[in-house]
């Protein structure tokens, strides 16, 4: 591992881009209020830098940055900008309220991008880097420059680009594996050689941003650390463009479990990993696969008799980390019908929610109603309540009636619209779910094409609930929806409304969002 850079911090800086690159994952768009909720959780998780969006390309991202900056003081808050003067100036304005602002500018450097995307020569790229990094530094002290598609850029030219960016005032240099093309050995060697051959390399932090197109994002990020990188850009659950990004939960647990090998730490409070992962799944309606490392439902499950026997003798036989280390443990505080508002507020804070008085009052009323239906209230239940009461403003399900008539089913749904007015519609379909979705489409005016639909149980025993997950298309864009209820048909309706409300709340979702992928 490269340890010759004396200015590098003794730990890895975690740069979370869930709210920017992660949001570019199909169906994962978040409006400003949802981004604030997620940013609170990332702050509680201990993330060093939170990239909130691309304000020059989206008014919603501009508003999200403003909301987040007003509240969060500890982490550095970053926004992404192209190497364009207007973009940079807009981004700087969005950062005005931030206590620790960072302006993140990028420009493609590979021959493929120079020829077909930018139509710029090497000299023009170098000139643009110098001009726009210099401009950024006059507006914001903390400037990160990313050489997009760095891993497919000629090494001698990448050295020159990096030198120019540092000379112009960049404080962090990011060398992304934009299309997930590289191998760990290539990434390690690239960072080692760039750091060794660039004048001023000891004055900046080097960063890696690896995509998962070949399933190597985490491995490549670890290799970058071995090569001298001291910032890793990642997302919760690995969401992001195409196959996604380096998964924060996997990277941080590798560094923790294999600390004797890497000998470097992060600031992440790992016991909050699972709750943060589950919050994101709820907000964007995209569940992780059950066998997902660290945060999947089966991550600590043992079914084989041989494995179970070993676990009974000693957990270390088949577990390299304890479930409690990442948050797979129930709260010691049991919430139920006798719990007070202070207890509910404390648990919500632990899950990353900081509520105003009016919102807390509304959530607590919903909590008491839920306690009349079930004995105990879990973290999953609280996250569902937060969706229903403070995030998912829009159409609310008031009632529904499903009936089967021969080979056809009838559905009657009654909704409360965003203005509080009641809307009722009926529809027929090939089965109860088909009829239900038809009635919901008629009531909301939103047309969704169903790709996949799954229902499974969450929770334990009598308090278990059904969770519906569906994948749909709208205007050729894919979206994921999640709903939870004691009744699986109601859960299905809530999952459908989850998508519809996101589309209706954010008009940008009704169109194809501008592709601003930096990877």
Swiss-Prot record:
The keyword Transferase applies. Pathway: Amino-acid biosynthesis; L-leucine biosynthesis; L-leucine from 3-methyl-2-oxobutanoate: step 1/4. One of its GO terms (cellular component) is cytosol. It is an enzyme of class 2 (transferase). Its EC number is 2.3.3.13. Pfam families: HCS_D2, HMGL-like, LeuA_dimer. Mn(2+) binds at residues 21, 209, 211, 245. This is 2-isopropylmalate synthase. It comes from Xylella fastidiosa (strain 9a5c). Residues 396-519 are annotated as: Regulatory domain. The keyword RNA-binding does not apply. Keywords: Amino-acid biosynthesis, Branched-chain amino acid biosynthesis, Cytoplasm, Leucine biosynthesis, Manganese, Metal-binding, Transferase. Homodimer. It comes from the Bacteria. It is found in: Cytoplasm. Catalyzes the condensation of the acetyl group of acetyl-CoA with 3-methyl-2-oxobutanoate (2-ketoisovalerate) to form 3-carboxy-3-hydroxy-4-methylpentanoate (2-isopropylmalate). Belongs to the alpha-IPM synthase/homocitrate synthase family. LeuA type 1 subfamily. NCBIfam families: leuA_bact, PRK00915.1-3. Residues 12-274 form the Pyruvate carboxyltransferase domain. GO terms for molecular function: 2-isopropylmalate synthase activity; acetyl-CoA C-acetyltransferase activity; manganese ion binding. It catalyses: 3-methyl-2-oxobutanoate + acetyl-CoA + H2O = (2S)-2-isopropylmalate + CoA + H(+). One of its GO terms (biological process) is L-leucine biosynthetic process. Its cofactor is Mn(2+).
């Amino acid at each position: 591992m490269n340890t010759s850079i004396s200015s590098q911090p003794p730990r890895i800086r975690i740069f979370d881009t869930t709210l920017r690159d992660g949001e570019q994952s199909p169906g994962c768009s978040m409006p400003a209020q949802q981004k604030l909720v997620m940013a609170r959780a990332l702050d509680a998780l201990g993330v060093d830098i939170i990239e909130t969006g691309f304000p020059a390309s989206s008014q919603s991202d501009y508003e999200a940055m403003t909301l987040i900056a007003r509240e969060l003081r500890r982490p550095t808050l970053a926004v992404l900008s192209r190497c364009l003067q207007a973009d940079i100036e807009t981004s700087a304005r969005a950062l005005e309220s931030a206590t620790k602002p960072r302006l993140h500018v990028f420009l493609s450097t590979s021959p493929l991008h120079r020829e077909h995307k930018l139509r710029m020569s090497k000299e023009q790229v170098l000139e643009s880097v110098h001009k726009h990094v210099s401009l950024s530094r006059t507006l914001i002290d903390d400037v990160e420059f990313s050489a997009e598609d760095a891993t497919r850029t000629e090494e001698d030219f990448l050295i020159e680009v990096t030198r120019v960016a540092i000379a112009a005032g960049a404080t962090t240099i990011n060398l992304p594996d934009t299309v997930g093309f590289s191998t760990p050995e290539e990434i390690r060697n690239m960072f080692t050689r760039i750091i060794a051959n660039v004048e001023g390399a000891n004055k900046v932090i080097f960063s890696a941003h690896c995509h998962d197109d070949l399933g190597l994002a985490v491995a490549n990020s670890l290799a970058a650390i071995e090569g001298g990188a001291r910032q890793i850009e990642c997302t919760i659950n690995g969401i992001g463009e195409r196959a996604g990004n380096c998964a924060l939960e996997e990277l941080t647990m590798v560094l923790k479990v294999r600390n004797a090998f890497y000998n470097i730490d992060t600031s992440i409070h790992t016991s909050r990993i699972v709750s943060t992962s589950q919050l994101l799944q709820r907000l964007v309606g995209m569940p992780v696969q059950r066998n997902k490392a660290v945060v999947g439902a089966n991550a600590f499950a043992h079914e084989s008799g041989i494995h179970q026997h070993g676990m009974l003798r000693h957990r270390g036989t088949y577990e390299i980390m304890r479930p409690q280390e990442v948050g797979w443990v129930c709260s010691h505080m049991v919430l139920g019908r006798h719990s007070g508002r202070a207890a509910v507020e404390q648990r919500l804070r632990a899950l990353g929610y900081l509520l105003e008085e009016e919102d807390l009052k509304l959530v607590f009323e919903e909590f008491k109603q839920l306690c009349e239906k079930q004995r105990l209230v879990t973290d999953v239940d609280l996250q569902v309540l937060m969706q229903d009461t403070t995030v998912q403003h829009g159409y609310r399900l008031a009632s529904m009636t499903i009936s089967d008539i021969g080979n056809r089913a009838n559905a009657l749904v009654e909704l409360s619209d965003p203005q509080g007015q009641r809307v009722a519609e009926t529809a027929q379909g090939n089965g109860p779910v088909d009829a239900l979705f038809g009635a919901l489409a008629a009531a909301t005016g939103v047309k969704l094409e169903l790709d996949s639909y799954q229902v499974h149980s969450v929770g334990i025993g009598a308090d278990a609930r059904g969770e519906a997950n569906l994948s749909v298309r709208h205007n050729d864009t894919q979206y994921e929806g999640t709903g939870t209820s004691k009744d699986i048909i109601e859960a299905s309706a809530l999952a459908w409304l989850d998508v519809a409300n996101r589309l209706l709340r954010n008009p940008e979702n009704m169109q194809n969002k501008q592709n601003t992928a930096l990877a």
